[in-house]
Amino acid sequence: MARIRFRGCPITQFASILPQQGANPPRAKGVVNLSTKKLGENSVLDTLLQSGSSKCLFPRASAQGLDAVLLNTAGGVTGGDSFRFTANAAEGTTLTLTTQACERAYKAQPRPYAQISNHLTVSSGARLNWLPQETILFNGSALDRRLQIEMDPDATMLLVEPLVFGRAAMGETLTDIRLRDRIEILRDGAPAFLDAMRFSGDLQAHLCRPHVANGAGAMALVVFASATAEGQLAPVRHLLPDTAGASLIQNDMLVIRMLAKTSFALRRALMPVLRRLNNDTLPRCWML
């Protein structure tokens, strides 16, 4: 275990210990816990803990708040891997979270799932932007992913979760996958939004149904929870392609669902929407 300081913030880093010879092959594990604080008018890093295959990078500070870039040094996830991320946007701060690259869910062994667990809290008067790049599902993958966001009543939150079904450039189709995906948003301790998906088997056949995805190769969910959400509905609808829709599920919560033929088409359609909902800014990682 090592303790260092970064920009005045204490950082704890743990070294991974590999199993003894003859044990099962080591699986990738990673943990990142971070929190922000207010320093004058700026949002800055308060605490950071990182271990294993998870790392967190911090571009230069900006007037928009603190940006953090998550990195999986294992290059992807497969059966038996475990990644946990926790972040707290403290009162009055702005925190933007993204990933350095697309996450890849590789072919897994028959039994274990790859586990990804993300838990975010947004305190009073704070804003959190959860803007990971696409997760790409490979044929044979097994992924169990959970995202929980806890918000104070006057907090603001923007999230996007893009999902890509196979490697289109290689002609890959998802005929055998296992997927469990759950997104939960709590406001003042009460459930405000829940989206859950569970699938096992031939996903490609399911996606090809006209009433499901009509052969789409990628999809995304966007949620904007803010006192200004209602005023964003009409402008956002104007930006959407024919394969997307937006609605208010509460006066202060806007939900967008989007389908696209390819991951490139999905990102190209998402970018103007995210810019609109994020004060005309996006992390550099998102640039085409």
What are the roles of these predicted feature ranges?
Residues S54-F58, Y106-R111, G140-A142, A168-E172, ...:
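A short, polar/proline- and glycine-enriched secondary-structure boundary/capping micro-motif
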Residues A2-E134, N139, R275:
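N-terminal, charged/glycine-rich beta-strand/loop interface patches
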